[in-house]
């Protein structure tokens, strides 16, 4: 069910049980014209709670839930995503075709930030960094992804004893580095887009998805270039162990 919004209202579950009012964020789902409220306490497993701003960024996300209470006078119901996720994790753990290493499964975007996102994969809430999203560098994930998206991923590791799951989204595609040495020989000049800066280096995306780690030619400095600008670079070397191309930025283009 799609999360339609959130509200800083009282924790309804606690109010109905104990007649106590507690200010708390709640997710709101409206399937079939019936409002279902998911208190923050029913969104996450104990010990895995997320900050309120994560819940605020989940508008549009698709979530599973179990109805735990119906308030007929108030015309709403209370749902638990936490309990629904337990059921999903049990299902995943008992399906060999889903949990085996290398299996291709689906995950759903819950919240997206500039450099990382939160996804749900069969009841497992997983933080995924930009490096695991795509081989190409992405300046801001929010320009490419949004809550509610369903995308493919690869199971990297599953520990049934501790219920731990690791996935990779980028490995559903072929690494563009393979064959890059033939497509972009050392000494060749290529047009690229600056996608980020880190630790004195500059990440440049080539049109075929290869990322080239660059520095500047002697006549330029960091302030001369901005993320998103097109540049001309020269390929200098490859490190096959790191699957990395290196080059030097010559000028803007």
Protein language model annotation of sequence segments:
Residues 1-253:
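Single-stranded RNA-binding regions, centering on S1/OB-family and related RNA-binding modules
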């Amino acid at each position: 069910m799609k999360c339609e919004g959130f509200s800083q209202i009282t924790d309804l579950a606690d109010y109905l049980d104990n007649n106590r009012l507690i200010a708390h964020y709640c997710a709101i789902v409206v399937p079939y014209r019936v409002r279902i409220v998911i208190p923050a306490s029913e969104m996450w497993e104990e010990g895995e709670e997320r900050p309120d701003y994560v819940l605020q960024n989940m508008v549009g996300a698709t979530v599973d839930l179990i109805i735990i209470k119906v308030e007929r006078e108030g015309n709403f119901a209370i749902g638990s995503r936490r309990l629904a996720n337990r059921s999903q994790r049990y299902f995943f753990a008992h399906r060999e075709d889903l949990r085996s290493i290398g299996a291709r499964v689906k995950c759903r975007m819950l919240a997206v930030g500039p450099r990382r996102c939160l996804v749900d994969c069969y009841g497992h809430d997983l933080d995924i960094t930009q490096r695991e999203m795509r081989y190409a560098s992405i300046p801001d994930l929010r320009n490419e992804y949004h809550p509610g998206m369903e995308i493919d991923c690869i199971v990297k590791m599953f520990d049934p004893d501790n219920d731990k799951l690791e996935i990779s989204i980028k490995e559903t595609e072929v690494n563009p580095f393979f064959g890059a040495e033939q497509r972009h020989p050392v000494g060749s000049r290529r047009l690229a887009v600056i996608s980020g800066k880190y630790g004195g280096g500059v990440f440049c995306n080539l049109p075929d998805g290869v990322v080239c780690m660059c520095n500047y030619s002697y006549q330029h400095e960091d302030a001369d270039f901005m993320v998103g600008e097109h540049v001309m670079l020269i390929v200098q070397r490859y490190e096959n162990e790191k699957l990395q191309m290196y080059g030097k930025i010559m000028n803007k283009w």
